[in-house]
């Protein structure tokens, strides 16, 4: 990932951590002024050569959320304009840097803002399908794209405004007035994707298993609290570390399949047990 900032003006910054404040200019593209240029390259350690993606003129463009195909023959990039209201999912040949003929694979526009924050993720049991995350219905959700089934890239209106176009058959995996925060991984045995979401409450973070075929979701672990979750390599278990207003801290090993026993690793004592505590309520 190469960034050329030679054309960007210097912006004066003051370093106050030195004994006497010093001036340390920083590259900052002010609104309406020239921005940096980016190029994405693939370095081959065997040949010691770099092939750059032939993405065209990099002026006022951002290349984000870079990911590989499972066979390592292709590179996927979400390209964003400087206004950050037009996103394109594109694929390139990893050996030549040439773009795929049916690029873009997905296109999303909005009058104000699009926010692609996650690279695509292929299903470990089916490399012809991948998951794309989008906020096109107003909340960040998962969309399953099938590369075996091409469709005419017709423009569709999005629920949150703007529009989108798809080159592959696409199915929305999750939906609702809540946010998918991130993908932890997969349980290949149950064919489920393990996610963190705000479905229980916007003030919480909970783990869920989502069946890729049906879209059905299953809560993993305790419903209450803010959960920090680590997924095992197999995807069969999580280490769930969580707290709430009434739970000081619990750490548990929880099966993601919904079957089996939860094992408690830690049940912390309440350090405020001897105090008369007020009733805590939170509103939005």
Features from the language model and the residues they span:
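Cysteine-rich, disulfide-stabilized extracellular repeat modules
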Residues: 101, 126, 138, 166-169, ...
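Beta-strand C-termini and the immediately following turn/loop, strongest in propeller blades
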Residues: 1-4, 30-34, 69-70, 76-83, ...
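Short loop/turn segments that connect beta-strands within beta-propeller blades
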Residues: 44-48, 94-97, 147-148, 211-215, ...
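Carboxylate/His-rich catalytic cores and anion/metal-binding grooves
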Residues: 16-26, 33-37, 82-100
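Intrinsic disorder/low-complexity segments
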Residues: 153-163
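Non-catalytic accessory segments flanking enzyme active sites
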Residues: 1-2, 7-10, 37-39, 53, ...
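Extended catalytic-interface subdomain
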Residues: 1-10, 24-26, 31-48
């Amino acid at each position: 990932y190469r960034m050329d900032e030679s054309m960007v003006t210097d912006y004066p910054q003051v370093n106050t951590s030195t004994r006497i404040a010093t001036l340390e200019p920083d590259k900052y593209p002010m609104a309406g002024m020239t921005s940096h240029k980016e190029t994405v390259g693939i370095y081959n350690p065997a040949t010691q050569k770099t092939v750059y993606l032939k993405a065209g003129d990099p002026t006022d463009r951002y290349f984000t959320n870079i990911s590989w195909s499972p066979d390592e023959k292709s590179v996927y990039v979400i390209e964003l304009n400087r206004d950050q209201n037009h996103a394109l999912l594109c694929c390139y040949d990893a050996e030549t840097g040439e773009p795929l003929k049916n690029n873009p694979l997905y296109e999303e526009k909005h009058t104000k803002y699009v926010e692609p924050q996650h690279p695509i993720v292929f299903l470990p049991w089916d490399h012809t399908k991948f998951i794309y995350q989008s906020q096109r219905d107003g909340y960040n959700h998962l969309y399953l794209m099938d590369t075996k089934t091409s469709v005419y890239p017709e423009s569709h209106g999005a629920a949150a405004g703007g529009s989108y176009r798809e080159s592959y058959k696409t199915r929305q995996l999750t939906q609702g007035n809540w946010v998918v925060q991130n993908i932890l991984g997969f349980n290949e045995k149950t064919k489920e994707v393990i996610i963190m979401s705000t479905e229980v409450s916007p003030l919480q973070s909970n783990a869920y298993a989502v069946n890729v075929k049906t879209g059905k979701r299953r809560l993993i672990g305790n419903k209450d609290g803010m959960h920090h979750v680590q997924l095992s390599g197999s995807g069969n278990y999580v280490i769930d570390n969580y707290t709430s207003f009434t739970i000081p801290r619990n750490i548990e090993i929880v099966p993601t399949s919904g079957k089996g026993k939860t094992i408690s690793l830690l049940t912390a004592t309440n350090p405020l047990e001897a105090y008369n505590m007020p009733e805590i309520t939170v509103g939005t």
